[in-house]
Amino acid sequence: MGAISFDWQRMKNIQQIHRILYTIGLGPIVGKIILLLTTTGRKSGKLWVTPLQYEEIDGAYYLGAARGLQADWVRNIQANPKVDVQVKAWHFQGIAEVVTNPGQIADFLEVRLKRHPRMIGLMMERVHHLSKRPTRAQLEELAKTEALVIIRPEAMR
């Protein structure tokens, strides 16, 4: 039920466009659903910037990882949970927590479906081969292959 035949290279190209939009000052526009996450490479020590969709819930930033624990940015966080984040024009440092509990991930997916029914419904259908309105049981099954990252801000800049 997970992402069976998704074009991850195309996703990287889209992420590059989001990076450019932030760079040229359009962060406040794309920042409604996209943030820039900076992690430290677990092997290289280099800083890596990844544009990701997010949900703000009770002052924390929630990021879904469709590739689960295989996503490089998630693996970097597992090695070093200190991250930098840019949301719109705001920059802050935070501590990231990787969550693999299917119940918590399913809760997050329900929030996303409620807030963005068309976009997330389309992703459920095209990426995960589910209906646009999956059941709780389907979300919990999908959640077994995914990960959730929760970032709690430390200091705003």
Where are the predicted features?
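Short strand-connecting beta-turns/loops that link adjacent beta-strands
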Residues: 57-59, 90, 156
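Short, structured beta-strand-loop surface elements
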Residues: 68-148, 154
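A broad, low-specificity signal marking well-ordered, structured residues that form hydrophobic/aromatic
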Residues: 35, 52, 61, 83, ...
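Alpha-helical membrane-targeting segments
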Residues: 1-34, 118-141
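Charged, low-complexity, helix/coiled-coil-prone segments
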Residues: 12-24, 47-57, 153
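Short beta-strand segments
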Residues: 32-66
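N-terminal short leaders/motifs
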Residues: 1-14, 36-43, 94-107
